[in-house]
Curated annotation (Swiss-Prot):
A Pfam family this chain is assigned to: M20_dimer
GO biological process assignments: peptide catabolic process; proteolysis
Name assigned to this protein: Peptidase T
Organism: Salmonella arizonae (strain ATCC BAA-731 / CDC346-86 / RSK2980)
TM region positions: none
Catalytic-site annotation from UniProt: 80, 173 (proton acceptor)
Length: 408
C-alpha cells in the first residue's frame, strides 16, 4: 500500500528516543532528524502551509478537493519513542504469513511467545514486524506516522473527495511535553484524531487522570554505634511511606477502569531519600482522593520528626481524562466508528490506561480521540506491529476524511 512498509522501516531506523528531565523541547536531537525528513516528504507530496516550530511541532495542510462548508479535521502522531528501552540501531524482523508458535528475536534466547502474548493466536497468516530482541521497535508511534503519511498519499493520488486535512507530528509525547507547545489555533482543525493506539479496531476517548508525586525525605546520619535517639534514617522513612500505600492498588494488581499508585523510582541514603510516584485514575473524584491520600501518608510518617529532618511532598498534575471534552462532540466518535465498520472492522471502545497527546489537546480546545495503529507490546523488546493492521489504519484514516466530506 503506497510505500507504507518502506516508510515505516525508514522511520524506525532513526533513533528518536525522548529523554525525561530535560528542559529543551524536543529533548533529543534524533527527533529533529525525523521531523526534518517528514517536512521534506510533505513538501515533496505537495502539501501546503508546512511549518516546523522551534519546539519541534510539524504541521501541514492537504487542501480540500471538494467545495462546500466541510469542517477541517486533523490527524496527529508523535515522532519520539519511549525512554524506557533502547531505541538505537533498531533492526526490525519481518515475519511473513505467521504460522503460530514462538518467534525468535535475533540470535539470542529472546522469543515472542503466544504463551506470554496470547494476542498472537489472533494474528495467524499475517505479516508481523518485530524487534531483534535488543531494542524496542518504535511502532509507538512511528506506525502512526507512517499511516498518516501513507493516507495523505492515498487521498492525493486517488482523488478521493475530502475537505481540508490538517496533519501534525509532535515531539516528546513519551515524556509528556509535546502537546504543551502545540498551537491549536494555528493548526486550524475543528477536531482531530491521534493515531497512537494499539490493536485493530481500538477507538479510545477515555484516559487516566494523571499526576506525579515527588517526595523528598531529609534524615540525619550519625555513626550507627551512637545512633540511638539521634539518627533519623531517611530510607526507613521511605519504607514506612510505601508500606502505607495500598498494596492492591498498584499497576500489577489493577486493570480496566481501576486506578493505581505506582512507585516508579526510589533512591537514597540515611541522610536523604527521594521517591517518585505516579497516580492514575479515570474518575476525577477518586483521582483527587488519591492525591489527598499521599499527603496524609507523608504527614503521618513525618509526624514528630526533629525540626532539621522533614518530608517534603510535591504533587503535579500531568493530564486529565479527555472523556469530559470528547463526549461534548459525539459526531467525532460516530464518524470514526462508521469509518471502521465501512472497512470491515468492529470498533472496540476501550479506556486508555495511559495518556496521549490527545488528552492534553482536548483540554486545549481540540477534541482528539485516539485511533489504532496495529501495534502491540509498546516500550520494550517484545513490541511488534502487523502490516495488515497498519494497512487497516490507513483505510480508516482515508474513510474518516471521506465521511467528513459528506457531513456538509
Amino acid at each position: 500500500m503506497d510505500k507504507l512498509l518502506e516508510r515505516f522501516l525508514h522511520y524506525v531506523s532513526l533513533d528518536t528516543q525522548s529523554k525525561s528531565g530535560v528542559r529543551q523541547v524536543p529533548s533529543t536531537e534524533g527527533q529533529w532528524k525525523l521531523l526534518r525528513l517528514l517536512k521534506q516528504q510533505l513538501e515533496e507530496m505537495g502539501l501546503v502551509n508546512i511549518t516546523l516550530s522551534e519546539k519541534g511541532t510539524l504541521m501541514a495542510t492537504l487542501p480540500a478537493n471538494v467545495e462546500g462548508d466541510i469542517p477541517a479535521i486533523g490527524f496527529i502522531s508523535h515522532v519520539d519513542t519511549s525512554p524506557d528501552f533502547s531505541g538505537k540501531n533498531v533492526t526490525p524482523q519481518i515475519v511473513e504469513n505467521y504460522r503460530g508458535g514462538d518467534i525468535a528475536l535475533g540470535i539470542g534466547d529472546e522469543v515472542l511467545s503466544p504463551v506470554m502474548f496470547p494476542v498472537l493466536h489472533q494474528l495467524l497468516g499475517q505479516t508481523l514486524i518485530t524487534t531483534d530482541g535488543k531494542t524496542l521497535l518504535g511502532a509507538d508511534d512511528k506506525a502512526g506516522v507512517a499511516e498518516i503519511m501513507t493516507a495523505l498519499a492515498v487521498l492525493k493520488g486517488n482523488n478521493i473527495p475530502h475537505g481540508e486535512i490538517k496533519v501534525a507530528f509532535t515531539p516528546d509525547e513519551e515524556v509528556g511535553k509535546g502537546a504543551k507547545h502545540f498551537d491549536v489555533e494555528a493548526f486550524g482543525a475543528q477536531w482531530a484524531y491521534t493515531v497512537d493506539g494499539g490493536g485493530v479496531g481500538e477507538l479510545e476517548f477515555e484516559n487516566f487522570n494523571a499526576a506525579s508525586v515527588n517526595i523528598k525525605i531529609v534524615g540525619n546520619n550519625v555513626h550507627p554505634g551512637t545512633a540511638k535517639g539521634v539518627m533519623v534514617n531517611a530510607l526507613s522513612l521511605a519504607a514506612r511511606i510505601h508500606a502505607e500505600v495500598p498494596v492492591d492498588e498498584a499497576p500489577e494488581t489493577t486493570e480496566g477502569y481501576e486506578g493505581f499508585y505506582h512507585l516508579a523510582s526510589m533512591k537514597g541514603t540515611v541522610d536523604r531519600a527521594d521517591m517518585h510516584y505516579i497516580i492514575r485514575d479515570f474518575d476525577r473524584k477518586q483521582f483527587e482522593a488519591r492525591k489527598r491520600k499521599m499527603m496524609e501518608i507523608a504527614k503521618k510518617v513525618g509526624k514528630g520528626l526533629h525540626p532539621d529532618c522533614y518530608i517534603e511532598l510535591v504533587i503535579e498534575d500531568s493530564y486529565y481524562n479527555m472523556r469530559e471534552k470528547v463526549v461534548e462532540h459525539p459526531h467525532i466518535l460516530d464518524i470514526a466508528q462508521q469509518a471502521m465498520r465501512d472497512c470491515d472492522i468492529t470498533p472496540e471502545m476501550k479506556p486508555i490506561r495511559g495518556g496521549t497527546d490527545g488528552a492534553q489537546l482536548s483540554f486545549m480546545g481540540l477534541p482528539c480521540p485516539n485511533l489504532f495503529t496495529g501495534g502491540y507490546n509498546y516500550h520494550g523488546k517484545h513490541e511488534f506491529v502487523t502490516l495488515e493492521g497498519m494497512e487497516k489504519a490507513v483505510q480508516v484514516i482515508v474513510r474518516i476524511a471521506e465521511l467528513t466530506a459528506k457531513q456538509q
